[in-house]
Amino acid sequence: MSPREIVLKETNQIDFISNQSIFDISPISGWKPFAPTDQILGIFIVFVLLLTFFIFYKLKLKKADSLKNNSYFLLLFQMLFVWVQDTTADLLGEENKKFAPYFLMLLLYIVSSNLVSLLGGISPPTSSLTFTFSLGLATFIGIVVMGIRYQRWNFFKEFAFGITVKGKKYSTFIPNPFSILSGFAPLFSISLRLWGNILAGTVILALFYNFWIFIFSSINNQPLALSLGTVFAGLITPVLHIYFDVIAGVLQGYVFVMLTYNYWAKMRNQGLENNNASELHFKGIKVIQENI
């Protein structure tokens, strides 16, 4: 029995309501929100792989007492971490360089989740909308935090109706539903982008496998069917997996991280621009008062 069949198998076959487990709860017919899926198995595998990776990195780091003793593994990972640190400092400023470990972990987590499908029989966790929405929610919370941190009350004024008096714009503090809806756009955009791209690759690979199963199952000569299936699978399947799992998986992880950088940097830059404009305004008033 494959891992997919093991995970998707119902954990409780008893029909009596009194003996039902939490996995059998079905608010809507055909939908069991608490039933484990193969994406859950994929998340657990990614957790174990990343935990093993960092433990191994820590052990290797302790043994490396000089640059000469550093292995290629340590050098590559340190180069990746330095790149993330520099990117964080360039886009978010030196004061936010402390967020570099988060972006590094986010990149490794998404890429690992995309590559877990190479193990066979396991759908990538990123093919689940719940998973990508959770990642998007973390990015969205960061947007709000960065907006409040750098823009203060001006962040909330963006979601209210404004009026212009003598060329100056003032906030009415009356909520603007369209601005509020647009404020949630990054959450849905970044979540659906990752989910849609990975799900599309998963569906294409599934259709490809089922297509060849259908073709070769019609051959009465079983040894011939197995031989042809092996040849076609060996020639074509690796190419598709390299593109949809490896290339697309790494690319989508990179895109997600860079979009998170962009959203956070936008909040910071808008706040700095407003603060600079306010400082120039007050300096101008002070100069005028001194000259009067």
Curated annotation (Swiss-Prot):
InterPro entries registered for this protein in UniProt: ATP_syn_F0_a_bact/chloroplast, ATP_synth_F0_asu, ATP_synth_F0_asu_AS, F0_ATP_A_sf
PROSITE patterns registered for this protein in UniProt: ATPASE_A
Main location, first listed in the record: membrane
Lineage: Bacteria, Bacillati, Mycoplasmatota, Mycoplasmoidales, Mycoplasmoidaceae
Highest rank taxon of the organism: Bacteria
Single GO MF descriptor: proton-transporting ATP synthase activity, rotational mechanism
Leader sequence residues: none
Protein name: ATP synthase subunit a
Keywords, sorted A to Z: ATP synthesis, Cell membrane, CF(0), Hydrogen ion transport, Ion transport, Membrane, Transmembrane, Transmembrane helix, Transport
Family membership noted in the UniProt record: Belongs to the ATPase A chain family.
Function description: Key component of the proton channel; it plays a direct role in the translocation of protons across the membrane.
Keyword Repressor: no
Pfam assignment, any one: ATP-synt_A
Localization annotation: Cell membrane
Transmembrane segments: 39-59, 73-93, 102-122, 128-148, 172-192, 196-216, 231-251
Membrane topology category: Multi-pass membrane protein
GO biological process per UniProt: proton motive force-driven plasma membrane ATP synthesis
SUPFAM superfamilies reported in the protein's UniProt record: F1F0 ATP synthase subunit A
Coiled-coil regions listed: none
UniProt subunit comment: F-type ATPases have 2 components, CF(1) - the catalytic core - and CF(0) - the membrane proton channel. CF(1) has five subunits: alpha(3), beta(3), gamma(1), delta(1), epsilon(1). CF(0) has three main subunits: a(1), b(2) and c(9-12). The alpha and beta chains form an alternating ring which encloses part of the gamma chain. CF(1) is attached to CF(0) by a central stalk formed by the gamma and epsilon chains, while a peripheral stalk is formed by the delta and b chains.
